[in-house]
Amino acid sequence: MKHAGVLALVVLLAAGCASGTASPSKQTAAKPRCSARQLAGWQRLANRIHAPVYCPSWLPDPLDGVIGSRWNNIDAVSRDRSYLESWVWQETGLGAAGGELHVNLRGYPERTRIPKCIDADTARRTLIPCFADPHGVVRERGIAATVYTVNQDADQWHILYAWRHAGSLYAISEHVAPPVNYAKVRIYLNRILRGLVLVEPS
């Protein structure tokens, strides 16, 4: 009986320890947050277009996701309220001394169809989808993004993720160019997607 009591006590203690410790696979990832500098510009953009936008809490270094920063080479809103925000870093030189990091974020308020672009490779300059050649879906934090590998305009030679939210189309893309290859760009885009913060107009 004494041995049985000790065994029961050990079982109870083990159960108590197990109930108080969550396994790593079940722990909830921290909710991403944009810095105050990042959030200020994205809030202004959301208010300007009267639609939600996605603030990137993470971009590959040295890109910062701050609208108006030294790396923000494009800050554009069209008459239809669609927007393009772009960050680029370029370094000239041979081999590892040179390279480019270029990330775009797009939004098309109240539109879910893929936009059309002029085919610059043909004399007739016909309209073709701006995003094409889908290669599966990536799911992160409630977003189901389709991966496109043939893209036009500012997204040419980029891998692009596009998804829909509340009746609007959104996209992120990154240029496949040294110092990053296709596999590394996919890793970066997955992390960017995972770190997006939805900003509603105020």
Q: Language-model segments: what does each one mean?
A:
Residues T21-A22, G93, P109-R111, L169, ...:
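Residues that cap or initiate secondary-structure elements
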Residues L7-G16:
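Bacterial N-terminal signal peptides
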Residues A18-K26:
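Bacterial lipoprotein signal-peptidase II cleavage site
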